[in-house]
């Protein structure tokens, strides 16, 4: 399938300015040149044209937002200065499996100031003595060459980098929320709840206290009643005793009169 047809198929009824990623791998470049891609793809951030028999970048449109460019397994041998002119914000460039042979060809990438990762794997240039040291010296802005930095530490996967960025954004949002504190009125509501709870407890204690006092009063009244009852019984017993003595004296007096 030709590149122009492949582009139309990948659009899927979208306008070119709505596309941020475009994969055109394994299609065919007529005469080894880019066709069907133009300046209307101004929002493009990722472009892949791997194994499309591309030999020239002369017809590459201006893509100022492009960050990642995949050009592996083509027949590019030069003309890399176009990249700095058309895609000045590139951070990742894959030229592995192309016809790049010498350092002078790569030197054109010095003007890509934001370039961090470059792949030249399976290019003839990798057979040069001190290849890695020479590239890092020539392109001092890059961090990773063929997937590794100067200390042979492997480059993070691009998807992991994206995830880290998202996690970083979420952490920042959480920190912002923590710094902002609780929403307005939140503390006041808590205080109101505590006051209500306190008043409920106070009312409960008052009710318990009242009931306790009422019980004491009732008990005191009962005790007073018992005391009154006991007093009345004692008075009755005393009165009966007095009446008994009086009857006894009356009987004795009657006896004395009979004797007379």
Curated annotation (Swiss-Prot):
Coarse class of the protein's main subcellular location: cytoplasm
Name of this protein: Acidic leucine-rich nuclear phosphoprotein 32 family member E
Bias type Basic and acidic residues, positions: 241-251
Protein family (similarity comment): Belongs to the ANP32 family.
InterPro entries: AN32, Leu-rich_rpt, LRR_dom_sf
Sequence position, cross-link Glycyl lysine isopeptide (Lys-Gly) (interchain with G-Cter in SUMO2): 68
Renumbered residue ranges of the record's region Disordered: 149-260
SUPFAM superfamilies: L domain-like (SSF52058)
Free-text comment about domains: The H2A.Z-interacting domain (ZID) mediates a direct interaction with H2A.Z/H2AZ1.
Biased composition (Acidic residues): 149-208, 218-240
GO CC, any one term: cytoplasm
Location of this chain's protein in the cell: Cytoplasm; Nucleus
Record organism: Mus musculus
Taxonomic path: Eukaryota, Metazoa, Chordata, Craniata, Vertebrata
Keywords for the protein's UniProt record, in alphabetical order: Acetylation, Chaperone, Chromatin regulator, Cytoplasm, Isopeptide bond, Leucine-rich repeat, Nucleus, Phosphoprotein, Repeat, Ubl conjugation
Biological process according to GO: chromatin organization
The protein's role, per its UniProt record: Histone chaperone that specifically mediates the genome-wide removal of histone H2A.Z/H2AZ1 from the nucleosome: removes H2A.Z/H2AZ1 from its normal sites of deposition, especially from enhancer and insulator regions. Not involved in deposition of H2A.Z/H2AZ1 in the nucleosome. May stabilize the evicted H2A.Z/H2AZ1-H2B dimer, thus shifting the equilibrium towards dissociation and the off-chromatin state. Inhibits activity of protein phosphatase 2A (PP2A). Does not inhibit protein phosphatase 1. May play a role in cerebellar development and synaptogenesis.
Entry comment on modification after translation: Phosphorylated. The phosphorylation is nuclear localization signal (NLS)-dependent.
Stretches the record annotates as ZID domain: 207-260
LRR repeats: 18-38, 43-64, 65-87, 89-110
UniProt entry tagged with the keyword Cytoplasm: yes
N-acetylmethionine: residues bearing it: 1
Pfam families tied to this protein: LRR_9 (PF14580)
């Amino acid at each position: 399938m030709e590149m122009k047809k492949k582009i139309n198929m990948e659009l899927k009824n979208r306008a070119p300015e709505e596309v941020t990623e475009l994969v055109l791998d394994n299609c065919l470049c007529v005469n080894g040149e880019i066709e069907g891609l133009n300046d209307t793809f101004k929002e493009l951030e990722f472009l892949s044209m791997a194994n499309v028999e591309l030999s020239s970048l002369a017809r590459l449109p201006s893509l100022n937002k492009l960050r990642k460019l995949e050009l592996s397994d083509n027949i590019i041998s030069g003309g890399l200065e176009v990249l700095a002119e058309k895609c000045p914000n590139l951070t990742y460039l894959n030229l592995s499996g192309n016809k790049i042979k010498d350092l002078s060809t790569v030197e054109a990438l010095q003007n890509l100031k934001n370039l961090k990762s470059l792949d030249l794997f399976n290019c003839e240039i990798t057979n040069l003595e001190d290849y890695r040291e020479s590239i890092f010296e020539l392109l001092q802005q890059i961090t990773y060459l063929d997937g590794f930095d100067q200390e042979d530490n492997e480059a993070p996967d691009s998807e992991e980098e994206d995830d880290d960025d998202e996690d970083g954004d979420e952490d920042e949002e959480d920190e912002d929320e923590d710094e902002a504190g609780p929403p307005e009125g939140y503390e006041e509501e808590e205080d109101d709840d505590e006051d209500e709870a306190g008043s409920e407890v106070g009312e409960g204690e008052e009710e318990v206290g009242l009931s306790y006092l009422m019980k004491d009063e009732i008990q005191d009244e009962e005790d007073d009643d018992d005391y009154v009852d006991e007093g009345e019984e004692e008075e009755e017993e005393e009165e009966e005793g007095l009446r008994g003595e009086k009857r006894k004296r009356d009987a004795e007096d009657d006896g004395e009169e009979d004797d007379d």
